[in-house]
Amino acid sequence: MLKTKRKSKKSKHKHSEKTTALSKKEVAAQKRKTSKKRNELVQAIVICCLVSAAVSIPLLFVARPKIAIAGGVAVAILQFSYKYPRQALWSFLIYLPFSGTITYAIGGGNAAFQVAKDAFYIPALIGLIQSCKKKQLPLFIPKEMLSTFSILLMMAMLTLIFVNGEMQLNPMKGDKPILQAILGLKVLIGYIPLIACTYYLIRTKKDLVFFGRMHVVLAIACCLLGLIQYLLLQSGKCAGTRGMTGEELYKATLQARCFVGGSLVFSPEVKFIRLPGTFVAPWQWAWFLISNAFLTFASAFCDPSFWWRVIGLFGMALVFANAVISGQRAALVMVPVTTAILLVLTGQFVNFKRFIPIGAGLAILLFFGAATNPGVVEQRWESFVDRWNAAPPQQFLFNQFEQSHNFIIDKPLGRGLGRATNSTRIFGFTQLIETFQPKLMYELGYPGMIAFQIMLLHLAFLTFRAYRAVKDKNLRSYGASFWVFVGFITINPQYYPLDVDPVSVYYWVLAGAILKLPKIDKQVQDEKHLELEGHELEVHDQLKEKKIIASAPI
């Protein structure tokens, strides 16, 4: 009996010695790996600096200093984004809400700055594709959507070849129909790969939580800048469109630009305000606020940390405040409606006590706002009611469909890719169509419009199925919050949010995040079933996380 006890003690001692030796080897290997990565980073920085200088110095002789420096920085970003796609995709999401401000503050409105975010996205996408090929991982996610996407792509290519191609044979003066079609196609489907990018970007629950927190911080930063912009205009430090006459009082202009963002309207004498926040145009700011009603809600009710939930609630309050002062009717209506819908559909109504602090905060904020700016909320509501009465949304949408139908009576494949896309006007004439489905009908005809809408509905179904398969309560709430946004944009008939920032990015990004939830849920469920305690559990979690990170393409 005594001998067996001694043997068991010796075996335990040997096992602990092996474990210690193994852990020492692992630590040494980790140190070598870290050192190698550090050296690679230093080398990459040196090369990027040299290439950037080689580009900037010659440009100084032919362009303004700002443009020359920006050109060099752009080349460095392209190199870095290709080498470090993961960091590039995070940078892409961070840069997005500030792109309008950077475009005018640094670029002076240069068109190149409006697509500068793609300097992060495109090289990162190329890097991801190469990494997926090496690790034999799927490139197109979700695989089930490949059929509907292929049909859409086929319809788009038919329009490009037979409609834009025909126009290219006999173009109008100044028109470049093929270039317009290529840019139009990029706007239409160029960000669909963000589904796969986000799917591989979010590897674990930690990444998902970081994703939510990052967007809350971005929302708070942008909303604070938006509040400052409003206060500067209200105090008269920025003139806005005060003192102008006739139509100029109602027209967004860059001459009225204030502090951040781009063109705006601020004509208090006629009770007409349209603020751009940190974006190029007021409509983009409205849809940023609507998008962040979903993103801040997700963190406010799903984040595992109490303090981050409080920060999320603060973000929701700021989004609501900006929806009131921005002058955007869509944001004024959709932000509170969205919050109410999310409370019901995500099942968070049972946690309504969490909503009490934000309710009290909003009440104080609105009371203070009403005291210092009497009539602001009333003006916004009156503006919304007047607009509704002047042009009811259902009638406006019907008129848009009728107009597009009349344009394509003799053109079954539409009028051409990019011909109703605002960002392609540098390559030729564009028709102003203010709603998305009629715009698709004008460009691609009935077949193309139906193909695109079917693809969106298919994606909405696949994401719904993915989030409903999740068992973990918190992850399911994240999925529900994200899916309501995807579902809303899928069936939204007003404006064309999928054509412009930020919705053209957020829609595909959140779809990718939802599709990853079942895998993250499996990781969480596996951890729950482990019968480990204390240090053993911590070591196991670290090893598992390392394996997940090592197997990921980025």
What is each model feature region?
Residues 2-5, 224-238, 266, 323-326, ...:
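A membrane-periplasm/extracellular boundary helix in multi-pass inner-membrane enzymes
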Residues 311-319, 463-495:
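Loop-to-helix entry and N-terminal half of a specific, functionally important transmembrane alpha helix
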Residues 2, 150-157, 193-197, 210-236, ...:
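Alpha-helical transmembrane segments of multi-pass inner-membrane proteins
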Residues 339, 357-358, 480-493, 497-547, ...:
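Transmembrane alpha-helices of multi-pass inner-membrane enzymes
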Residues 374-447, 463-470:
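Long extracytoplasmic/lumenal interhelical loops at the membrane interface
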Residues 26-31, 102-106, 173, 260-278, ...:
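Juxtamembrane membrane-water interface segments that cap and precede transmembrane helices
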Residues 80-109, 115-190, 489, 549, ...:
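N-terminal hydrophobic segments of proteins, predominantly signal-anchor/transmembrane helices
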Residues 69-83, 121-133, 289-303, 449-470, ...:
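Hydrophobic, aromatic-rich transmembrane alpha-helices
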